[in-house]
Amino acid sequence: MKLQEKQTIHGFAVDRSRYVPELHSQAYELHHIQSGARLLYIQNDDDNKVFSISFRTTPSDSTGVPHICEHSTLCGSRKFPLKEPFVELVKGSLNTFLNAMTFPDKTMYPVASRNAADFKNLMDVYLDAVFFPNMIKDKQVLMQEGWHYHLDSADSELTYRGVVYNEMKGVFSSPDSQMERHVMDALFPDTTYGVESGGNPDDIPSLTQESFAAFHAKYYHPSNSYLFLYGDMDIDQTLAFIDGEYLSQFHVQSVDSAIGRQTCPGSQVKTYPYGIATGEKTDHKTLHSLTYVIDDALDPTVAMAFKVLTYVLLQSPAAPLKKALVDAGLGKDISGDFQDGILQPLWGISVNGSDPDKQAQILPLVRKVLSDMVRSGLDKTLLTGALNRTEFALREADFVGRPKGLIYGIRCMDTWLYDMDPLAALSYEGALETLRRGIDNGYFEGLIQKYILDNPYYALVSLVPEPGLTERHDKALADKLAAYKASLSKEEIDAIVADSQALQKRQATPDSPEALETIPTLTRDDLEKKVDSIAMEQQTMDGVTVCYVPDETNGITYVNAYFDLHGLTREEISYVYLLSDLIGDMDTTDHTYGDIASLIDLYTGGIDYSVSAFSNRTDNKDYMPVFRFKAKGLTQNLDKLVDLLKEISLHTVFTNKDRLAELVEETKAGWDMDAFRRGHTIVMHRVLSYVSPVEAFCDAGELSYYQFITDIAGRIRSDADEIGAKLSAVMKKIFTRSALTLEVTASQEDWKTAKVVVPAWIQALPQGEKPQGLCDFGLSRKNEGIMTSGTVQYVAKGGNFRSHGYDYDGSLMVLDTILQYGYLWTKIRVQGGAYGAFTRFYDNGDMVFCSYRDPNLRSSVEAYDALADYLESFDVSDREMTKYVIGTLSRIDVPLTPSLRGAKAMSRYFTGTTEAIAQQRRDQLLATMAADIRALAPRIRAVMEDDNVCVMGSEAKIREAKDLFANLVSLPD
């Protein structure tokens, strides 16, 4: 059905209709006459349908009320009176996306599904949640999702608990997050951007139930809403449903959600402390941020221009401003960022791995370098390459498994929220044309002059490390709570105990069957029985296996090279991981690293380098370690892409000592900033490395790599020749024809070109010897407590069930869903207050449980240990079991882009997973019943009794539970 301008349909007026060539879609702007709701519909033939409803939410304090509201609306509503309908949807729908998101000035609720009935169910639950949530009258929702005083008994220690409270404690454990908050405080003292929409842990306990309910009443009205629809759907039925079930129950009202524009408060220069561990060194751990407010960047052309400039000046390996800052010794890790999606966008420079005395030198150097560039002109080759890179990404529209409509729905809010054309943020042809012309007419230089050099609206903020600060803050909080408890009467203490116990009882009580049945669900008959088939042709070119995956790729060819890493020593494995961080950013015999970067940007869609491993399906001692080149480009430029792959793999040199040192030190500084944020990944691989050779190999790129790069960074200035020689040696050892397997994803027509062009790389590689043997990592149970200055934990426990004689089958995929959104969700998130927990079960028998931003430690380990008991008595209705099966399929059957299809095909290839094996797994999954889940209890019990534990988190918490660990260690210093 096509809509017509000026048409009225189901209470909606069609205000405007336009074709959007960039999306190959027809776009309709509508408004709901009675309620005032706005609606944008992007009509096309994409079966991955998307719906979202967003609200402009402008908090006036840092209690996190928008964030807590986002969590809480999905905790039961008028039509769906369950404790957490969101969880029921996750485990019982065919969604391809399901989440909610809090931004500085808006809250979004998007869903996606390829199944029409499922899509309608998702819309129904989400619309009821945002307009009629139980959180308004049920104070236990705020207690659970936001915060509450917690007392187990009158004699116990008074604490704060709450999911968002602990989530934000984890967020603010990262210096980067602290820096972002300080920058926004400095730049926006008088507007909503000057407060933390996610919530500051120090302020969250100030939120009252009355303020919470009032916030929802004010902002969650259709007159303040933005509805978005995308894809192939019956729009007549969809609009009728939205109107009849929801919007017709409201009338237009005035909602004061305006975002005030901050007038320039003058330039700001500020310094703040951040916590590091007691006794930790402070050298090179200061962060600086120079950030400018770019008021006119709501213009999509200006916004795109600043993204191009950010890459040219600060992100490209050839970036001149980054080089100037590094050469001046101001920092080890330099990066840049353009932040749109707010009324007054920001352009910023981050200088990490620095010291406090460097602050005064940053602004003068930046101004000098940029002034010189404006005077002499920016490098046109760099600009052209950066713009080509931007254009390639826009046209490819590969969002790494996320639905296209989801990304478009978020992007359109970049203008729509500020009362501008929503399609302006989705159209890019005009901006590309303007910027192409701008390379030669001084456009970019003019932007630098106007928005940076002549702009007084900036903040220079520094974060200086202070050992023991976190511990002192935690003690002050404990003292504050103890003093508050001491001020309470017996009746008041008893009331807190009663409230705490009542909440725990609610959390432990399952929803009634009647409540569960309010959530519509599909049946097993509705489910796709056949496994996704990925066609792959194999042939041999010059002795190398080449796998071809046919797909429609819009003129793009994807080339993936996998070099076998058998035969490496333990030291060589560390150097291979280092090589993946450096290669492509170093000189070659024919080009400087800057020239290489420019050629990649000019002629390709990017080349990435990584190290990974594919495990044997039935034996974790046997695996395929690989170094991967992941490259893509327009087929018309495939010859240039292959030339670059050939040059980088064969002719990279490590003789530029300064460049080598800069990259090593930048890598180390990056780990210093990111290690805690990726704590769940670190502990997951680390705990499995105690028992699994393949995971020991992966850990060589995680915590072990952080330890390695710390050592290398400490001696790179003196030992550059030795380190460079080892990198060269390992590069020559691994990049051989005998070690190579190639994969190409392209259309049939483009494959003809690839078959002619790609052999040039194969033929250039030395033959080499077939790699043999795997490294002996000397596995042992270390049970480490990794102590940090963070205030939350990442708690992992795992092992291998095949070592106990158990096999893998498809029911374990269903168990994953049951645990993540049942047992662990309740125990770790709902009752424990962690942000989340997840499980992993692998074909080779490796399995792990891990919590994320967890305020607890011992109780989470105890929850893992009690899991087998839970499974032994697991008993749910057939309807509930079917929901778990459906939810499992929704995670497996995600729509694949061409690049993801190629990657999935190669995963099956390297692990020996034939289509027949994949079909067997699916059949087992689809047939899983409660009895099959109970039968898994012995293998879980066996692995938990192996007692492999690894935790990263608060030093105090880890020391309190030191009996759980054989080793207490700190992150590298």
Regions found by a protein language model. Give the residues of each.
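M16 family metallopeptidases and their MPP-like homologs
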Residues: 48-58, 84-132, 139-150, 177-202, ...
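Generic recognition of flexible, low-complexity loop/linker segments
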Residues: 97, 213-217, 275-278, 321, ...
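Extended, regular secondary-structure scaffolds
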Residues: 214, 226, 235-253, 376, ...
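Non-catalytic terminal extensions that flank enzyme cores
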Residues: 1-50
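His/Glu-based metal-binding/catalytic segments typifying zinc-dependent metallopeptidases
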Residues: 43-45, 52-54, 165, 169, ...
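Active-site His/Glu-centered metal-binding helix of metallohydrolases
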Residues: 65, 69-73, 579
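Non-catalytic, conformational "gating/processing" segments within enzyme and secreted inhibitor domains
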Residues: 161, 213-243, 724-758, 945
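Hydrophobic, small-residue-rich alpha-helical packing segments that form membrane-like cores
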Residues: 153-224, 228-246, 250-277, 282-284, ...
